[in-house]
Amino acid sequence: MFRILLFLATNIAVVLVASVTLRLLGVEPYLQGSGLNLTSLLIFCAVFGMSGAMISLFLSKWIAKMSTRTQVIEQPRDAVESWLLDTVRELSSEAGIKMPEVGIFPAHQSNAFATGWNKNDALVAVSEGLLRRFSKDEIRAVLAHEIGHVANGDMVTLALIQGVINTFVMFFARIIGNIVDKAVFKNENGHGIGFFITTIFAEIVLGILASIIVMWFSRKREFRADAMGAKLAGSGAMIAALQRLKAETQMPNEMPDTLTAFGITEGVKQGFKALFSSHPPLDERIAALAANR
């Protein structure tokens, strides 16, 4: 409920700020005079912007299973699978959530992810590489980290943030398109080619800039998931797991782009590219855990 209220409050705040800004700049009267209704435009953008994010959220488990070829453990076939189920059951109980589905996906890289539309209908999966190279304590810490994502409602939070971002990227791109169409292309009869070209270009540019905001939120929630992992599995085990991941940073990332934000780690990014990273540097995560031991 808090996240929904936060989402609504964010929308209202941005609408008010946008309205005041457009009035102060003298843009709103011009737009209304050219036939562009801001309220209708915002509703249109909100419907499409939020719909895309929500559809992705509700389909996230299915998409994750298909894109990673994850095999959900229905009946354990060996001692490792039995241990995985028991460990996830124990951790989810400690975190106060319903036990998620547990799966294994084929990848040499050590990684794991959690996804699902709510904390009581989630999926936690680990790679074959992680099971081969990590100790049980380290695997438990990684699972605790992913359970932390689920318990914190990170999938829902990021979907809501992405929906808000989608809405306002569409909204402001169309305002820019309308201004350019009227002022530069001198089109007074509906929307001309200038509107469509400018809108597409503006959506691309604004979308790239907006993704920096989404990734900033993503990096912040990684610290929270690490803290939950340390709480459930112990700081020592969580730090050891991250240190082992650090030793594998040169390995290619086999996680689909759509799931990178929900993995335990991603490839190292430097300079400007770091702004688009969904995970903080492993050294920063290790330092944060060490400081709170």
UniProtKB/Swiss-Prot annotation:
Cofactor binding, per record: Binds 1 zinc ion per subunit.
EC nos: 3.4.24.-
Record carries keyword Transmembrane: yes
Active-site positions on this chain: 146
Record key words, sorted: Cell inner membrane, Cell membrane, Hydrolase, Membrane, Metal-binding, Metalloprotease, Protease, Transmembrane, Transmembrane helix, Zinc
InterPro entries given in the database record: HtpX_protease, Pept_M48_protease_HtpX, Peptidase_M48
Chief location: membrane
Transmembrane residue ranges: 2-22, 38-58, 156-176, 193-213
Similarity comment text for this entry: Belongs to the peptidase M48B family.
HAMAP family found in the cross-reference section: Pept_M48_protease_HtpX
Protein known as: Protease HtpX
